[in-house]
């Protein structure tokens, strides 16, 4: 794609979001509700490394921040961080500024800037958040490479891009609306009108209609969401193969998907020892491809990349685990209770010993507290029990013995 074409596509994308600022969540005069652990630095870092970060005083870039929904979470969930938000659309940035001002998110600066031009920013960032953006760029590889230059050593890049298999019906409707718009394509209000009329005209039994009602109807009640989904001027949907072409081009290291439950082969073919054995002979990326072929409901990929060195802790050494300081995970809803929602809003039911141990752990973020050895002394709670809590993201461990790069 030529630079002239890239500029034209970028202008069309900016026009869409000037017309329909996105996401359209209401502006409120208080911090946003709940949490997204991917936007909470200690939780994201612990997920990627197995241990707490050495510092929470970091710099965060929200690349393609839109109307600031994610940005205000990044500010409120990370009270020691300085946040920068950039976006192409001036209209959307105006909403983002008002949103953050009203919710008290005051450690943020905004700038109208393309991801392609992110090199104009002076800082390098410990956490870069890029959600729902790269797949709308005319050259996503150029975009991810630009972001990679601004990631600090040991930093994390969190990315969300669309998956082709789970968005098949969306792609068909996008093409149909574009055909019916004809010379009016690029008039996004007309596109929304055409799309609404088309959905109203199709039979109830139509596959596209059924999928929209099952998966998207509540979300697409608002025109901003409908426009973003069905009349966007630029979209790239990925498969595992093309996703890793994007990742490899970044020059960064793939840390992992942030929804590991989906990528567990056992949940799909675990009933057959023979099929599992055959699947396990495949390479890791081939296994990922097999999973998405067998469960094509996935509508997006969400994952972390890093710039080495990124120290890792697996807590297999008893000495390291005994000396570590455990704190409760910050992203839990309903604690204190033996039943609550975890970092991913999945229901957790603790045993009595697990509840007792978790109750005696430090509050989130506290690192000057009792070690694992001190907490399990004179109890029947084992190191394997502690490892289980850590694997389930119910505790965050702060090492006192140096971690391995």
Which sequence ranges carry the predicted segments?
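A short acidic, Gly/Pro-enriched loop at the edge of an enzyme's catalytic core
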Residues: 119-127
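Conserved SAM/SAH-binding beta-strand->alpha-helix loop
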Residues: 89
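Conserved SAM-binding strand-loop segment of SAM-dependent methyltransferases
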Residues: 104-116
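A short glycine-rich, Lys/Arg-flanked "PGG" loop and its adjoining helix->strand segment in the class I
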Residues: 141-153
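Conserved class I S-adenosyl-L-methionine
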Residues: 156-208
């Amino acid at each position: 794609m030529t630079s002239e074409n890239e500029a034209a596509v970028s202008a069309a994308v900016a026009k869409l979001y000037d017309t329909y600022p996105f996401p359209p969540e209401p502006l409120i005069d208080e911090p946003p509700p709940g949490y997204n652990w991917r936007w909470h630095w200690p939780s994201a870092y612990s997920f990627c490394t197995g241990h707490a970060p050495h510092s929470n005083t970091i710099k965060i870039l929200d690349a393609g921040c839109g109307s600031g929904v994610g940005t205000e979470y990044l500010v409120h969930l990370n009270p020691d961080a300085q946040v920068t938000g950039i976006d192409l659309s001036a209209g959307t940035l105006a909403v983002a500024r008002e949103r953050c001002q009203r919710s008290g998110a005051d450690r943020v600066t905004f700038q109208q800037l393309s991801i392609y031009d992110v090199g104009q920013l002076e800082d390098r960032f410990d956490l870069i958040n890029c959600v729902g953006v790269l797949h709308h760029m005319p050259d996503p590889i150029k975009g991810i490479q630009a972001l990679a230059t601004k990631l600090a050593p040991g930093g994390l890049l969190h990315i969300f891009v669309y998956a082709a298999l789970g968005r098949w019906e969306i792609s068909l409707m996008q093409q149909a609306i574009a055909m019916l718009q004809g010379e009016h394509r690029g008039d996004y209000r007309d596109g929304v009108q055409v799309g609404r009329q088309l959905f109203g005209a199709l039979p109830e039994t139509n596959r596209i209609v059924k999928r929209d009602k099952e998966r998207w109807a509540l979300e697409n009640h608002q025109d901003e969401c409908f426009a973003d989904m069905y009349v966007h001027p630029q979209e790239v949907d990925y498969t595992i193969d093309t996703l890793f072409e994007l990742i490899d081009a970044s020059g960064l290291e793939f840390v992992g998907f942030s929804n590991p439950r989906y990528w567990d082969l056992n949940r799909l073919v675990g009933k057959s020892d023979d099929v599992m054995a055959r699947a396990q002979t495949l390479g890791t990326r081939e296994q990922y491809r097999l999973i998405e072929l067998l469960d094509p409901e996935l509508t997006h990929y969400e994952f972390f990349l890093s710039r080495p060195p990124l120290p890792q802790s697996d807590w297999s050494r008893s000495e390291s685990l005994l000396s570590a300081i455990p704190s409760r995970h910050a992203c839990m809803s309903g604690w204190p209770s033996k039943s609550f929602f975890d970092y991913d809003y999945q229901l957790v039911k603790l045993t009595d010993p697990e509840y007792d141990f978790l109750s005696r752990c430090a509050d989130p973020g506290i690192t000057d507290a009792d070690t694992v050895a001190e907490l399990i002394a004179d109890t029947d709670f084992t190191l394997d029990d502690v490892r289980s809590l850590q694997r389930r993201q119910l505790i965050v461990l702060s090492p006192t013995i140096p971690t391995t790069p």
